[in-house]
């Protein structure tokens, strides 16, 4: 009789497992990450400008650590974000990581909530990394290499639009500015990351050799580290590529637009995760995917109301 009871219990467990699995299927998202663009210049930044590379590795940790903590604390616990999570991020940056971290290990909850949004970030971050590698490397045809990686990026279903978006309008949702208002220190820290990511382009392009590139990075890194120590809470909007690297933005306007749009999407998602106006995890996921699909992905270009005409510039 014990055998029959065990069989019944096992059947119940199997049935429950299948039911749970079927319920979860509606939320299942395949991990369809692409391999990075392969070239001889891969990892040139890591090999030749390791100091700058380690700072970017810290940036990767900061975004994921923030999103995970916003989710797990409900987005309202100021000490948990401004003190604990921010200090965790600063400690990781100070450790000078030699490799970029596994962001899914840092933010497993967020990755389950909004995998497609995270993969949108990952693809654009890979474009960042590729452009740095090309500029630091001894690649003789840098212009063509950059055009090639842009074309590779734009083949992705997760590619952010290369058109200029109206960032001011994208900052007018009902939940907009929640994050920077409630967490000004961490917000300014995030904007400091974005300063570093775009401020390096013009100096890297202008420097003729590795020694000159190394020298050119010193004042930018010094400024960035000052921002980490004393976050620029007086800033009212995120840094823009054309403001900090105007030569790069003029030469590669599509890439500059992608990076600015990427950074605006970071701000939107921070606001969604922090806002009580988007109260549940399901609601947050729905809103994140709504704005990604409607306003940020290149696949929406034909009907995206946030695209700015060439004659306009809304910043």
What are these regions (language model features)?
Residues 13-20:
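Core hydrophobic alpha-helical transmembrane segments of single-pass membrane proteins
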